[in-house]
Each structure stands twice: as C-alpha cells, then as structure tokens.
Regions:
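Active-site mouth of glycoside hydrolases
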Residues: 58, 129-339, 344-349
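Recognizes extended acidic, P/S/T-rich segments that occur
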Residues: 534-575
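Pro/Thr/Ser/Gly-rich low-complexity, intrinsically disordered linker/stalk tracts
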Residues: 505-530, 590-617
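Aromatic- and carboxylate-lined catalytic core of secreted/periplasmic carbohydrate-active enzymes
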Residues: 28, 45-48, 151, 359, ...
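Extended acidic/polar, glycine-enriched regions
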Residues: 69-71, 75-140
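Bacterial N-terminal signal peptides
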Residues: 9-20
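Short beta-strand elements bearing conserved aromatic residues within extracellular beta-rich modules
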Residues: 59, 461, 533-535, 580
Length: 617
C-alpha cells in the first residue's frame, strides 16, 4: 500500500469531502442535500403547451465547495414547487459533503434563471446512518462497499419475497402510483423488520410484477415521454429522503423489464436518466442501475451510451451499474460501471450460485453485488443460497432468507478484509474466506465435517460457531495454526458458520480506510482489538530518494489517540508532500503494524519506522 499523502499547494491534494444542505440561510449538516430554488420570468405548463420546460430550458449551477472543488450541477423544472405542473419554479440540488461555506452561480438562457448566486453554510452532522456518508468503493478494499468515512457495509436487500403478501412480493414497485402512502409505510416497516439496508426500486415500470394487478410506476405525463409527472416525482423524492433518514439505501432502477422499453427512442431514455439524476442523485443514500435485464430492450452499445451519459450528469459520484440476464456480468471493465449487479441462476442450487458468484467476482477488481439468485422464500434453501453467495466474496446480497442473521454476522466479522479461499478446505462440504495468515471464516451448508488448511496462520486462534438460523454465537475453543484442523458442525446437518481469529489479546490487524476529510485532517476505519492509534508523518521526497522510512519520519501526530481522526496543521512546502501511516494499539497486546500486507510492499516497514527518533514510542 502506498502511504496516504498530502501535497503542497502546487500538487494534488487527496481527500474525502463532507456535504450538507441549508434552507433560508440556516446551516445544513454534512451529507445533507441543499436545494436552490429559482423562478423564471415565464410561467410554464409541464403537462401541455409550448414551450415545453422539460426540453426547452436548461439550468446549470456552478458550485464551489469550501475546499475549492468545482461541480457542474444540472437543474430541473418543478412546476409550482409542490407537485403541481404549472409554475415558474426551477431547482437544483447540492450534496454537501464538507463543512464550511458552499457557493453557487446559475447559468441559463431562460430569463430569470441566469446569473443568480448564493452561499450555503454547512456544519454539524446529519442524523442517522448516513452521517457516515454515502456508499462508495473504498480505495483500500475495492471489491467491497463502504461508507465515505471508511466504515465497511454489506448491502443486503430482499428484492424478491414470494412468501410476503402480494403487495410486498418485491421492493421494485415501491414507488408505484397504485400504492397509498400507508401501504408504502407498511412496506418500509416490513423491510426494517428484515434488517436489510437496501431497497431496489423502479423509476419506470409498466408490466413487471403485475400478477395481482397492475403495479405501474410512470415518471411521465401519461404516454408523453417528453414530460414528467411532477406529482409522481414529488412522491419519489419524498420517499427517497425518508429512506435516507431511516438508514436505507435507495437503489434506483431507471427501467424495468417486460415494459416495452425497446420501443422507446434513445433520446427518451436519456431524458429520463438526466432528469432522475438531477432530482435524486444529491441524496446521500442513492445508487443507480440503468435497467433490469438489459438484453430485452438495449443493445450493448446502447447500454454503454446510457452508462456514460448517466455519469456525465453524476457530479456526486453515485455508484451505478446495469443488470443482465443470468450469467456473467457483461460490462466488467466499463468505467461507468462502478459495481457489477448480478443475476445468477435463480432456480439453481447453492453450490451453482456460489460458483457463479465466484466467476463473476473474478471479472474485475470492483464490488460484485449478487442481486437476483433466489425467490426470497423464508426457507432453509433460500438461506443457504444467501450465505453461499456471501462466501463468494460478494459486496451485496439482494435476496435470500433469514437475512437479519447474515447482517449480524457481517457487522461482527471484518469480511471486507477477506477474500474467497475455498482451496483452504482440504476435504468436506464447506466454503472459506480468509484474511491470509490472520483469520478465516468457514461456512458449512449442510453441517458435517471439514478439514481446513491453517498452514498460513501461526499461534493460537479462537474458534466461534455462528448459527445462521438464530444469530447465536457459541465458543468452539481454540485451535493452533500452522497445519490442517478438522471441524465438525455442532448442529448435525444444519448449516453453520465458523470464525477463526487471533485471540482478543493479539495485536490489532492493519488499519484500513484511511481517507482525508479536508485539507488538514483524515479518518480511518474502526480496527478490531484496537483501543487506541498511533499516527506517523513523513517526508515524501526523502522516502522516495532514500527508499527507507527511518530518515523520512518527521513526526508522531498521535500517540495512543482514542478517536479515529488525526489533524496536521503543518502544510508541505510548494512542490513537496507528506505521507501518513496509522497503526492500531491494543491495551493488552501493544501496537499492531503500519503495514497492510499488500503484495507490493517491501518488508521492513515497522522496524524502519521504529528506528526513527521521531516515531511514536
């Protein structure tokens, strides 16, 4: 791992930002959404007549963040501003990812909208889960998701739930105009009861999931795809905010399958994408999928066009993907696809799902979200499928059963440090993931006995069983690393998971998720067994010239600091730079390592740093 760096004024500054919104001059918290409201000189009718405000008016804000970053933000027509079609209201939304004063200037060829400007103060913390920031792909763990503050997250959803009442067969129809507000409230409460954190929702659907009657979601005014139904969009955004405030990711899908999208012009498709991004992407909890089963309505080149177009109107860098028919993800190397949204054999057994998920994960070093692989029946079969997919190193699991206990397991076990390691299972029916030489998790789909190769580990490992049916942990004693060990499930032929980890008295593992939060400060991920942290700073030019850390270390910024944040008020000289490294410290076992064990790291980092008189003691 290359140490995180902070450069002088002439060079690049690497950081993560924080965002918020304000209203009537009040400061908005970090990661909230600010809304700029402008009024045109002319009144427009969004439902009929000319000119059509959705096709004839363009509004762009140039937004400057407190640290100087500049964003081009698309505005949108919003009728009377409250869901009515007739009015002079145009809006633009700003994702405030950094405390301080944000400024904006408008440009438009439409009278009343051009040359306006303002400022938005941002301070404080957004309540709830998204105080951690939006879901991103952390540089330190590129195959998994995390929040912007470095906290790892396994996305869990129940997109299909055929055991539920008809109105709750799927989350996709959540925005349908056929549902009442109370029905939507009941559906969200039901999702909370499952302890999932992600809902897949259509922005357009005509015929999908209509077995109990039509469940359309129409973003347009009737069949006129040049005009948007502003009352419907007000519902979309209101519930998107509600999901955010209640800790739920809104994974928004522009187009459903089985809905005639193949007959739409590309201009109509792109218009929906642009309008949807303008209205919804500034909310911290949003992610996007262009279409379900793209092969039914798009060519491969049209998918590429749509993905690139979406990213051109994605100033807040929301994650996006596309969903195909069962099989391999078709666009693993596309720059617009931030993650791979998968459909694998929905009627296959769990081992088929596991192998398919592994094959897809190997396509690219980006998150693989196994979305569609089970019908969601609350059965042992669906549960085993979900765990088998998770043990293929998936960053998200979109269906399955007993998901509350998979969520509990993922919150406890640092899965983001692990990779699939089925080769560690010498014999027996089991799957394995490992942080090589440190810790292992093993899943027994049918219980039984498995022989596991622990030759990469040394010393004693604590062993704990986890019951996927009840969420209960139980001790399996200790085992010794350095060889093969046999494990037998305590629940006969029922599925069980096993966690093998260093004893709690061991030194903490490497610190991950180091990310700048401004020009002078940076955070890092919570690290198992660390009760405090040491942070060292060094001179980048000296490290490059002498190729050793000892002479390059110039400060211990924190020694046994108890938070996960460090500030450095010293600015490098122009053309120069600093590097930073963090290690966890255990109250009982002492300090961990400044190294994270990447293959590209040369050995000796810790003793070299320790030999410097400027290093932390």
């Amino acid at each position: 791992m290359t140490p995180p760096t902070r450069m002088g004024p002439a060079l690049l500054l690497l950081f993560f930002a924080c965002i918020s919104w304000s209203l009537a001059g009040a400061a908005a918290p970090v990661y909230d959404t600010a809304e700029v409201v402008l009024h045109s000189a002319q009144t427009f009718d969004g439902n009929s007549g000319t000119p059509n405000p959705f096709t004839s008016v363009t509004l762009t804000l140039t937004v400057v963040a407190p640290d100087g970053r500049t964003f081009q933000v698309d505005g949108f027509f919003d009728g009377n501003g409250a869901g009515g079609a007739v009015g002079d209201v145009f809006k633009a939304r700003i994702f405030l990812d950094q405390p301080g004063t944000w400024s904006w200037t408008s440009s438009s060829a439409t009278s009343g909208l051009d040359g306006r400007s303002g400022q938005i103060p941002c301070s404080g913390t957004l309540p709830g889960l998204f105080a951690k920031g939006p879901v991103v792909v952390p540089a330190a763990t590129p195959r998994y998701f995390g929040h912007a503050d470095g906290t790892p997250v396994l996305l869990l959803g129940k997109m299909l739930d055929f055991d539920a009442p008809p109105a709750q067969f799927t989350t996709f129809t959540f925005f349908s105009e056929t549902f009442s507000e109370s029905e939507r409230r009941a559906e969200l409460d039901y999702q909370h009861s499952l302890r999932v954190n992600t809902m897949a929702i259509y922005l357009f659907n005509q015929n999908d999931f209509n077995d109990d009657g039509p469940r359309p979601t129409n973003p347009w005014v009737g069949g006129d795809r040049t005009r948007f139904d502003l009352a419907h969009w007000r519902t979309f955004e209101t519930w998107t905010r509600t999901l955010r405030d209640e800790g739920m990711v809104a994974q928004l899908w522009f187009f459903a399958d089985d809905s005639g999208v193949g007959g739409f012009s590309m201009a109509d498709r792109l218009r929906l994408i642009r309008y949807g991004m303008a209205r919804l992407s500034a909310y911290a909890n949003t992610m996007f999928v262009t279409t379900l089963e793209w092969e039914e309505a798009f060519t491969a080149s049209e998918v590429d066009q749509a993905g690139q177009y979406l990213q051109s109107f994605n100033p807040w860098r929301r994650l996006t993907s596309v969903h195909g028919l069962p099989g391999l993800f078709d666009f693993p190397n596309a720059s617009w696809a931030n993650y791979m949204d998968l459909q694998i054999g929905i009627l296959d057994d769990w081992d088929g799902n596991h192998q398919d998920a592994l094959e897809n994960r190997a396509l690219a070093a980006k998150p693989s979200f196994c979305q569609e692989f089970a019908q969601g029946y609350e059965s042992g079969f669906s549960r085993i499928k979900a765990w088998s997919v998770f043990f293929a190193g998936q960053a998200g699991v979109g269906s399955g059963a007993y998901l509350a206990w998979l969520a509990e397991f993922a919150r406890t076990v640092p899965f983001q440090r692990m990779a699939p390691a089925d080769s560690r299972v010498v014999s027996g029916d089991a799957y394995c993931m490992a942080e090589s030489g440190v810790q292992y998790v093993v899943y027994f789909p049918l219980g039984g006995t498995a022989l596991v190769d622990l030759s990469g580990a040394s010393g004693t490992l604590d062993a704990q069983w986890f019951d996927p049916r009840t969420g209960q942990w139980s001790s399996a004693g200790t085992v010794s690393g350095g060889g093969t060990v046999s494990f037998t499930s305590p629940q006969g032929d029922d599925d069980m998971a096993l966690w093998l980890r260093p004893p709690s008295g061991s030194a903490p593992p490497p610190v991950l998720g180091v990310a700048f939060t401004g020009r002078t400060g940076f955070d890092w991920s919570d690290t198992r067994d660390a009760t405090s942290y040491d942070v060292v700073r060094g001179d980048l030019a000296v490290l490059r010239a002498q190729r050793t850390f000892t002479p390059a270390v110039n400060a211990c910024l924190e020694n046994n600091g108890t938070d996960r944040h460090a500030e450095d008020p010293v600015t490098p000289a122009s053309g120069q730079g600093f590097w930073y490294l963090v290690r966890g410290v255990s109250a009982s076992a002492g300090p961990g390592s400044y190294s994270i064990g990447d293959a590209g790291e040369r050995p000796g980092r810790d003793p070299e740093i320790g030999a410097s008189s400027a290093a932390c003691p």
